[in-house]
């Protein structure tokens, strides 16, 4: 029983007794017949009546209080649908081009939203699905050397070529792999993920994105002087674009909130920069090419701490959020809400992030009818005499009896999604609806926590 019920009952009973006393003072004749005139020695029948009314009033009061979160939930779902949604797991994934594959010579594109699957440890083969957030183009290319030039003297020869006053610099040496020639490659832009631990990636990002004065490049085996250098455009930040979003975007939502949500969930997803027009430098570099970035200031953290492993090619952020056709939702006319279960065989392996589409079916499974969200923009465009609408509601998942007795796999509980139908024009139209087909964005709940990462080059999750 709700522990708040006793407090609400006492409040209601006190209120009834006080108002009864005031009523008895103003209307003595009526109060005398009701037994309210002497509250210190009340009529036992009237007292039982007051206690019963107080009990019913307390239950109604608690019900109204419990409805307020539902009201705010429906309101937020209409104006800011991502506020209440669970936060999916995010990580950085890396791709490796297959050496000798002729397809990568021209650049093999791995499109955004490509699904990647992994197996959760000790979970009977449960699959965890991630989707990439960036386009990744694979080239037979690698960074073989990385050197941070931390003094004005070290960058003086390069600064003279670029005609800038630089205090520090970064030299990256690119080489082709798989027997390919560097001059065969023509990447219009090359995204690089700044990997590493502690402050190294952040300092590199700050210098490359905010303190670059010039970018120059030439063949690593070039014996020419200043004539062999090529000036390249400044590097660009990568990952803030709308077409690089991990979380679903909404026109009615503030774009900055999406960026903040992604940053606090996985700050590494923004540690991407792009080098531009490297094909011009590669054209004159059959074996290897040196690219030098010149900075306006030096930082004491980076000298001696920068290695090729800090610059990951062919990486992209990924999110455990994907579309899924859920199992049919059977309707019971005696229940006003129905549980949306993504997979009845593995109910705890999925969590609904957002409902995308609902279709109603009759008992004969014919004449499917679309069901629109009630509290959403555009709902008024439907004919309310014919249309069906649904209202989703999130609830915190409760522990099952088995979970209460045995150990849970993690501390995360997550949420459950319930759905209710309404027909504003005529409620009897719901009698023909036998079940619902639901398509939604889902996550794998806490299964990403159970993934095992092996190797020395594991990327953050």
State each model region's role.
Residues 93, 106-109, 114, 300-322, ...:
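Surface-exposed flexible segments
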Residues 11-12, 18, 22-28, 47, ...:
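Glutamate identity and glutamate-enriched acidic tracts
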Residues 98-100, 121-122, 197, 295-300, ...:
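Short, flexible beta-strand-to-coil junctions
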Residues 27, 74, 82, 134, ...:
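Histidine (H) residue identity feature
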Residues 138-142, 239-244, 460:
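Short, surface-exposed linear segments at secondary-structure transitions and domain or protein termini
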């Amino acid at each position: 029983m709700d522990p708040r019920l006793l407090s609400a009952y006492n409040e209601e009973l006190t209120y009834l007794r006080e108002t009864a006393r005031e009523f008895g003072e103003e209307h003595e004749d009526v109060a005398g017949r009701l037994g309210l005139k002497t509250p210190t020695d009340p009529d036992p029948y009237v007292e039982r009546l007051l206690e019963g009314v107080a009990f019913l009033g307390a239950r109604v009061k608690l019900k109204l209080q419990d409805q307020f979160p539902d009201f705010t939930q429906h309101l937020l779902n209409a104006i800011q649908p991502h506020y209440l949604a669970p936060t999916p797991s995010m990580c950085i994934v890396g791709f490796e081009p297959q050496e000798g594959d002729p397809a990568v010579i021209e650049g093999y594109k791995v499109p955004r939203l490509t699904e990647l699957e992994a197996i959760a440890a000790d979970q009977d083969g449960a699959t965890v699905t991630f989707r990439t957030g960036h386009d990744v183009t694979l080239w037979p290319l690698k960074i073989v050397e990385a050197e941070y030039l931390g003094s004005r003297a070290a960058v003086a020869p390069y600064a003279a070529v670029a005609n800038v006053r630089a205090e520090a610099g970064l030299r990256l040496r690119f080489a082709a792999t798989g027997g390919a020639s560097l001059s065969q490659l023509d990447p219009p832009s090359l995204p690089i993920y700044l990997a590493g631990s502690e402050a190294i990636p952040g300092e590199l990002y700050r210098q490359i994105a905010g303190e670059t004065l010039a970018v120059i490049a030439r063949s690593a085996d070039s014996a020419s002087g200043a004539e062999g250098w090529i000036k390249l455009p400044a590097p660009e930040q990568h990952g803030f674009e709308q077409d690089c979003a991990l979380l679903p975007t909404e026109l009615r939502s503030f774009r900055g909130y999406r960026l903040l949500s992604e940053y606090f969930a996985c700050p590494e997803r923004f540690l991407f920069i792009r080098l531009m027009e490297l094909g011009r430098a590669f054209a004159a570099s059959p074996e290897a090419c040196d690219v030098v970035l010149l900075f306006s200031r030096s930082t004491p953290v980076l000298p001696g701490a920068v290695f090729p492993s800090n610059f990951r090619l062919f990486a992209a952020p990924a999110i455990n959020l994907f579309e899924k056709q859920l199992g049919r939702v059977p309707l019971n006319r005696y229940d006003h809400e129905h549980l949306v279960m993504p997979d009845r065989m593995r109910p705890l392996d999925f969590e609904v992030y957002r409902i995308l589409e609902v279709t109603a079916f009759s008992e004969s499974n014919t004449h499917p009818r679309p069901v629109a969200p009630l509290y959403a923009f555009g709902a008024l465009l439907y004919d309310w005499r014919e249309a069906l609408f649904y209202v989703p509601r999130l609830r915190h998942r409760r522990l099952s009896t088995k979970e209460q007795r045995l150990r849970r796999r993690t501390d995360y509980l997550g949420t459950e999604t319930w759905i209710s139908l309404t027909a504003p024009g005529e409620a009897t139209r719901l009698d023909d609806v036998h079940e619902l087909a639901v398509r939604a964005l889902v996550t794998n709940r806490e299964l990403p926590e159970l993934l095992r990462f092996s190797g020395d080059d594991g990327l953050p999750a």
